[in-house]
């Protein structure tokens, strides 16, 4: 059955500066900052949390249903979904703006300067989670426009669809009351360790307390160290999986969440879902971009 993935679709333009930002940006001159970086390499990737999650879920054999917005330049993304055999019925095209864009410059110290244009993402809230669909088994509220995240969470709850609250980099947009409302509406919460600390600070609740509630689990990713799973106040550590090589961490969290949705939709135990997520995250980090890793289902015994 389909998993409804609410989140962003974006194009990532990634460049490399063959020097150090520290040698180009003088601390005593930042008040008159005017710099230009020659970037001899450039690549464009399909990105955005919803797109990345959907890619992994589809590779695993799941059925992603993306709810997001693209701009007038979004035809390539729509064609990509159609090539997968994925439905675009909930992807809105906003003709008077661009698809969300991230423009990233990385230096030789792996420092990054990023400019982000939200574009069509600001209209994502105009598409609503359907209330009468019996075929949608599970959902996720991933980073998106602020209004979209608030409304889609409430709509999932009203429709009775279990969903993962995955605030990601969108977490700082919300205050404690709003985050508590998200948690009350959600079935699971997924964060990284930094986001987990911020969530606890803003809600005034520990991970133990958050999990000792109606939630079926709180998942905290720890990078190479694996993952913590909190259920009814009890913590379980699921070890990480060593990557063949570390090439690009972009989209690792999204790959993990695609695997998480795959397992949850099939009724797996949460720790088993997380184990698969750790394996897929290790696979993804060895590839550039968020949608280029290839998953061998037979090797995963799926």
Where on the chain are the PLM-derived regions?
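Glycine-rich phosphate/adenosyl-contacting loop at the front of the ribokinase-like
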Residues: 1-65, 76, 246
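Short, conserved aromatic-histidine micro-motifs
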Residues: 30-37, 75-76, 139, 275-288
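Gly/Ala-rich phosphate-binding loop of Rossmann-like dinucleotide-binding domains
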Residues: 58, 157, 265
